[in-house]
């Protein structure tokens, strides 16, 4: 997770005349630029955005802390590695770069318009293949959940014949360390198989992650195990777990879990392993892009409807949400002094997605959920239904992806009150054609990278630190088959994880600094004699991907550029355009306060 303290700092980035990028296929360095603001050089983050491409004096360049960090090399990624270092260049290099920039501008003129103005970014719909043909045939990652008595609870690969053996071995290892050292084992790595095991002791339940992925640290795996524990607590409170195992040490926890609970566990593990899931790595929520007046109108309707419910004792309704497809938050009604933790909401969204996957859209649910960050010893009760019924004329407008309406109460017997509130709210919303039309457009036609004038950008993720929410364009892939789309998500996941890992140490040690870091991945083109994967039209294209991460007190930006030659000056210019676009569209991209009572 990338987090910054709230403060204003001016980001100083050297101009192209001061610093450039050199690529060495044998190198594994990542160039990073950090700067700490002094009292005589403080400006708003917007000022830093506006002047990011300005030339700096030599004295200013001396204040720039140029650092490099090593990035591990993974053989499972076809020898793909980050290769970038930062250095200063002389005046002749600046002339060459100016010529290169002029040539690039001429090329832009020939592609886009006669006057050289770039109205739409040039982008490709695919990224080059980065995985070995057989890299996904073996299990590269697994999660185990079992009790202190060695009773299995869950394994990511339930049919894996080695799961029972693994759990028995892991239980023995844990017991040995507890007996010999009176301490808990945290992690170990097998040298022969290069498998890392990370342990999380939440007695009476143990969680273990097994991973061959070199780009995952122990802290990342441990955080994933903590999230799994949070989900288990959402089904059985901490008090209930303690009571169950006090009665019987060898209690079988699986008997208290529903089939949908195991489905949700599998979905969580899949998100951690194969899917692009920024919600977890950024510790935030994705918000549906919606016009500010429409969102405000929905919030007003939610508040006014609550005020009309005369038979509602104070505190009956705690929270209400409207959630769009793909776990995108649309609207929220909450108390003025309270809000739910992102982890609690992520669990809620995952539960909703799993529950409605097996139900018809006109069904309603009444589910007890423990939100561990809110209160790990008690339940809240969630009334959940879709806003549209299949019989409604407006339902077909969402093409099977209607938004979901959630009402949360602390009272176990408040079902009919929650139902009454949601029914009345749904009637008002469905009668408003403008709201339905805008919701449909936002849900079914999310914005893409082509809507932002940022040349050569393939994809980005922008997190607003103030809102604890992020936004990203729809995935830029033409893959129609699930397998190809899954491969595309794995590529994005690998690149974004590498970007975040490249600044993890700097973020932890330099909390008062803004940071820009570049990572470049390079690999020679495959020869004709090498094996290639089927259905991959870019297999012969050499990998030359540039990524950028920009952290400031106000935002975090993860950015991937098209495969090919992209200079750092072009990258900074496009990054600035994206930040400006996100800031100027903040009211439609993020929820500020929501409706409060």
Curated annotation (Swiss-Prot):
Gene Ontology CC annotations of this record: cytosol; fungal-type vacuole membrane; Mon1-Ccz1 complex; multivesicular body membrane
Molecular function GO labels: guanyl nucleotide exchange factor inhibitor activity; guanyl-nucleotide exchange factor activity; phosphatidylinositol-3-phosphate binding; phosphatidylinositol-5-phosphate binding; phosphatidylserine binding
The keyword Membrane belongs to this UniProt entry's keyword annotation: yes
Region (Disordered): 33-62
Compartments reported by the entry: Endosome, Multivesicular body membrane; Prevacuolar compartment membrane; Vacuole membrane
Example GO biological process: cytoplasm to vacuole targeting by the Cvt pathway
Basic and acidic residues bias: start-end ranges: 48-62
Primary subcellular site in the record, as a coarse category: membrane
InterPro entries to which the protein is assigned, alphabetical: FUZ/MON1/HPS1_longin_1 (IPR043972), FUZ/MON1/HPS1_longin_2 (IPR043971), FUZ/MON1/HPS1_longin_3 (IPR043970), Mon1 (IPR004353)
Compositional bias ranges of the Polar residues kind: 33-44
Membrane topology term: Peripheral membrane protein
Keyword vocabulary terms for this entry: Autophagy, Endosome, Membrane, Protein transport, Transport, Vacuole
Keyword Membrane among record annotations: yes
Superkingdom per UniProt: Eukaryota
Function: In complex with CCZ1, is required for multiple vacuole delivery pathways including the cytoplasm to vacuole transport (Cvt), autophagy, pexophagy and endocytosis. The MON1-CCZ1 complex acts at the fusion of vesicles with the vacuole, through its regulation of the SNARE complex during the coordinated priming and docking stages of fusion, and particularly at the stage of tethering/docking.
Family membership noted in the UniProt record: Belongs to the MON1/SAND family.
Protein name (database record): Vacuolar fusion protein MON1
Gene name as annotated: MON1
